[in-house]
Amino acid sequence: MAGMRRLELSEALHLGPGWRHACHALLYAPDPGLLFGRIPLRYAVLMQMRFDGRLGFPGGFVDLRDGSLEDGLNRELGEELGEAAGAFRVERADYRSSHAGSRPRVVAHFYTKLLTLEQLTAVEMGAPRARDHGLEVLGLVRVPLYTLRDGVGGLPAFLENTFIGNAREQLLEAVQNLGLLEPGSFARLKISTPP
């Protein structure tokens, strides 16, 4: 991931006091729905439009003196997503990766959390009442995990948006590793490399 190096969680936790830690979570749920009655949705994946106009995942900076990374992440989820985030808890078992950048000295920890479709829908419905809605978070969006017949609409077009940090790469890695796309469809994606 450009400008960032991957590191093990244990290494990230021992970087020292000059480093800040940010935790974010990809929330997803199986979705049996069909777009236009024929295109399988397969999964619902949430991202958010941030205050700076970029797409990212819910979460934010955490202070290790206040507890674990997960404690901080769950606090951030409550602030950004509202009461429905209290129906689940992101745990260490949901951890995926850590990446460090040197300027600024920030370690980005990434988690994925499987929810039920009902839980995910409750998050979407309650988010406009969350403390940070309209401030840090401008709204939630579902990632289209399909490609339309033109080969551009759907996920390829979505990936042309502007993402914060390495959120685009985290999304692609998670979608592939979790098997959220139809088998073989990831290899057929026409994805441009970001500038």
UniProtKB/Swiss-Prot annotation:
Residues that, per the record, bind substrate: 24, 50, 57, 166, 170
Motif Nudix box mapped to chain: 61-82
Gene: NUDT16
Keyword field contains Nucleus: yes
Highest taxon listed in the record's lineage: Eukaryota
Enzyme class: hydrolase
Keyword Electron transport: no
Binding site for Mn(2+) 4: 99, 173
Subunit details: Homodimer.
Molecular function per GO: 5'-(N(7)-methylguanosine 5'-triphospho)-[mRNA] hydrolase activity; cobalt ion binding; dIDP phosphatase activity; dITP diphosphatase activity; IDP phosphatase activity; magnesium ion binding; manganese ion binding; metalloexopeptidase activity
UniProt binding sites for Mn(2+) 1: 59, 80
Protein location: Nucleus; Nucleus, Nucleolus; Nucleus, Nucleoplasm; Cytoplasm
Residues annotated for Mn(2+) 3 binding in this entry: 76, 80
Domain annotation Nudix hydrolase: ranges: 18-168
Annotated EC: 3.6.1.62, 3.6.1.64
Binding site residues for Mn(2+) 2: 76
Catalysed reactions, semicolon-separated: a 5'-end (N(7)-methyl 5'-triphosphoguanosine)-ribonucleoside in mRNA + H2O = N(7)-methyl-GDP + a 5'-end phospho-ribonucleoside in mRNA + 2 H(+); IDP + H2O = IMP + phosphate + H(+); dIDP + H2O = dIMP + phosphate + H(+); a 5'-end NAD(+)-phospho-ribonucleoside in mRNA + H2O = a 5'-end phospho-ribonucleoside in mRNA + NAD(+) + H(+)
Cofactor(s) required, per the database record: Mg(2+); Mn(2+); Co(2+)
InterPro entries: NUDIX_hydrolase-like_dom_sf, NUDIX_hydrolase_dom, NudT16
Gene Ontology CC terms, in alphabetical order: cytoplasm; nucleolus; nucleoplasm; nucleus
Similarity section: Belongs to the Nudix hydrolase family. NUDT16 subfamily.
Cofactor note: Binds 3 or 4 divalent metal cations. Acts specifically on U8 snoRNA with magnesium as cofactor. Has broad substrate specificity with bound manganese or cobalt (in vitro).
Keywords: Cytoplasm, Hydrolase, Magnesium, Manganese, Metal-binding, Nucleotide metabolism, Nucleotide-binding, Nucleus, RNA-binding
Protein name: U8 snoRNA-decapping enzyme
